[in-house]
Amino acid sequence: MDYKHFKGKHANIVIEIISLLEKGVKKAQEILEKPDAGSYTKLENSSGDTPIKADLALDKFLEENFLSLENIKSVFSEEKETPVTKENGSYLIAYDPLDGSSVMEANFLVGTIIGVYEKDYKAQNLVASLYVVFGHKIELVVALEEVYRYAFYQNKFHFIETIVLENKGKIIASGGNQKDFSLGLKKALEGFFAENYRLRYSGSMVADVHHVLIKKGGMFSYPQKKLRKLFEVFPLALIIEKAKGEAFYFDKGVKKRLLEQSVESYHEKSECYLASPHEAQILEKYLKGE
């Protein structure tokens, strides 16, 4: 892989993680392709969810590999109660080993989300984000100074493009239970669809956000506090912001940046809106004051 795009203080650790992922893709594929990979276990993770077999197998594989990196001090999986910490190192990794696992049996797109933190697990300390999506092809998206997209081919990640969102998109990925949506959100969504926006929601956050990115705009929304800040929300928020979009939530009707949220507990959850500037502006108009 050509690493010419990665510059600055945190470039080296990102390159190390990508190199590790590049070498581990085939093993990850093997885990996902097993006939019983989508079968539910009898366990319960720290968030109260029941993981599938592929969740746990990928988690074990990734944890071992991340801990092998000299400059990684702490590794924290969504599947674990607390981080695994080493004596040395400068960076911390929080990751969701298999986002979208609930739709894997339907053969939908799933992926691994990775946030790279410095010093402590806080939004303000997030220095880079990555995700890998597994489908009929495998792609990697990385956010450092900008957002870069790669495709896996012949055992290597090959650069496709630098992703920059346009001011306005045409797709909406609206997750959550619609009967619980606020009146403002319902009106905003009705307005988008009246303007011929297309609904593109799969139940896999990483897949839906990836769709918004490769289409160069639109909106992903999940108004209920279900998504985990450290493992899903913050890493994908950074990617959207670096792609010139907006990542936000509403606090008593006031729009605020997701990456300015505090973290009171490791598995704390949040509502989440990731959007192009136009969609963010429209949503704020409808939800302001709610």
Swiss-Prot record:
Binds 2 magnesium ions per subunit. One of its GO terms (cellular component) is cytosol. Substrate binds at residues 99-102, 201, 226. It is found in: Cytoplasm. Mg(2+) 1 binds at residues 78, 96, 98. GO terms for molecular function: fructose 1,6-bisphosphate 1-phosphatase activity; magnesium ion binding. Its cofactor is Mg(2+). It catalyses: beta-D-fructose 1,6-bisphosphate + H2O = beta-D-fructose 6-phosphate + phosphate. Pfam families: FBPase, FBPase_C. Pathway: Carbohydrate biosynthesis; gluconeogenesis. Mg(2+) 2 binds at residues 96, 99, 232. Its main location: cytoplasm. GO terms for biological process: fructose 1,6-bisphosphate metabolic process; fructose 6-phosphate metabolic process; fructose metabolic process; gluconeogenesis; sucrose biosynthetic process. Keywords: Carbohydrate metabolism, Cytoplasm, Hydrolase, Magnesium, Metal-binding. InterPro entries: FBPase_C_dom, FBPase_class-1, FBPase_N, FBPtase, SBPase. It is an enzyme of class 3 (hydrolase). Its EC number is 3.1.3.11. Belongs to the FBPase class 1 family. Homotetramer. This is Fructose-1,6-bisphosphatase class 1. The gene is fbp.
